[in-house]
Curated annotation (Swiss-Prot):
Gene3D superfamilies: Probable brix-domain ribosomal biogenesis protein. Residues 1-155 form the Brix domain. Keywords: Ribosome biogenesis. Disulfide bonds: none annotated. This is Probable Brix domain-containing ribosomal biogenesis protein. InterPro entries: Brix, Brix_dom_Rbsml_bgen_prot. One of its GO terms (molecular function) is rRNA binding. Probably involved in the biogenesis of the ribosome. GO terms for biological process: rRNA processing. It comes from Methanococcoides burtonii (strain DSM 6242 / NBRC 107633 / OCM 468 / ACE-M).
Length: 155
């Protein structure tokens, strides 16, 4: 998976991209003037995550396949706990836990194992109204889901 941002991201959005890349053990790349197809062609396994900006903060996350087709779009707001400060995370394998349609979609697209959250791990707790990113038993941040849209595949 490759993570990038909108073309002119705010500092908050760039920080969120770095945190997501560190959490998922993948690469973050600044987009600059590159088009979506140019970025997609650089993806190793074909999954691209684009973090969009809204009024100076991360406002959306979109997932694209290897052909640049949108798979999932999530509109969100971000909550950081008191004392939040970005630090790189250890390269532990993340797991996902939760319930609901969004959990199933993320589990499928991100291709990370489903499992319990332990005190010495990275875990994404997913439901249809929020995504909590947990590291070493502490919440890093929470994405409050405003709405999401999945791509409907034609038969």
């Amino acid at each position: 998976m490759l993570i990038t941002s909108s073309r002119k991201p705010s500092a908050n959005t760039r920080t969120m991209c770095k945190y997501l890349a560190s959490f998922f053990n993948c690469k973050y790349m600044t987009r600059g003037k590159m088009g979506l197809i140019d970025i997609v062609s650089l993806c190793e396994n074909g999954l691209l995550m684009v973090v969009g900006d809204y009024h100076g903060s991360p406002g959306s996350i979109m997932f694209y396949d290897s052909h640049g087709v949108e798979l999932l779009s999530i509109h969100l707001s971000v909550f950081y706990p008191d004392g939040y400060k970005y630090t790189p995370l250890k390269a532990l394998e993340p797991s996902i836990n939760g319930d609901g349609e969004l959990f199933n979609l993320l589990s499928y697209y991100l291709d990370i194992p489903e499992g319990e959250c332990y005190y010495d791990s990275k875990c994404l707790i997913a439901s249809d109204d929020h995504l909590e990113f947990v590291y070493l038993d502490n919440m890093l941040f929470r994405l409050n889901i405003k709405n999401y849209r999945k791509m409907v595949m034609s038969e």
